[in-house]
Amino acid sequence: RALDDLVTQGKIRYIGCSTHPAWAVMESIMVSESKNYVRLSTEQPPYNLLDRRIENELVPLAQRYKIGLITWGPLAMGVLAGRYKTPNEYPKGSRAARRGGFYADRISKKGIAIGQEFTKLAKKIGISAAQLALLWCKDQPGITAPLIGTRTIKHLDILLPVLEMTLDDDTRKACDVLVPPGSFVADFHNTSYWNRARVLE
């Protein structure tokens, strides 16, 4: 009710949530409709080629109920940009190196192997791996927009041209071969108690 009041009073425009499972988003929609409250406009889940689990339930739910999906982690913390070579050696300045914990837990042997193949695919089509990672996420069905967390203007300049790019069918299929739809090789939901999983190496 508090969020409904904030919207109706003009203090905020929209309501969103982050890293919620499909059932929790659906529960929120049902409560809003039964009580005539303003309902969720967006959900902000982790989503990248290495962790595609939201495609199983959350994406179809969002499409049906017109919920925007503003996803985070499109570059998989740099794994899809080819920054990692081994699971136990983190690039200087990376979140895995600086903070460890659940950030480091997202780095998997399988994820790194996929990242290296992904880098080759990007080179083959003539763009950077970071650009391809963002492009793949941007052009997936049901995704409203991916969030980017660049720390430098240089990185931003690399990614901005992706706005004008379109993912072709052949590249999409090649990505599906690397990590099939709905599956995962790295756990980016590892801060969510309802969706933690272990990646078997």
Stretch-by-stretch model annotation:
Residues R1-R53, E57:
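Glycine/proline-rich, positively charged
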Residues R13, V38-S41, G68, S128, ...:
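Short acidic/polar active-site loop segments enriched in Thr and Asp
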Residues G126-L134:
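Short catalytic/ligand-gating loop segments at beta-alpha or beta-beta junctions
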Residues R64, N88, K92-K120, K124, ...:
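Terminal-tail/helix-coil boundary detector
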Residues I54-S94, S128:
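Aromatic-lined glycan-binding groove of carbohydrate-active enzymes
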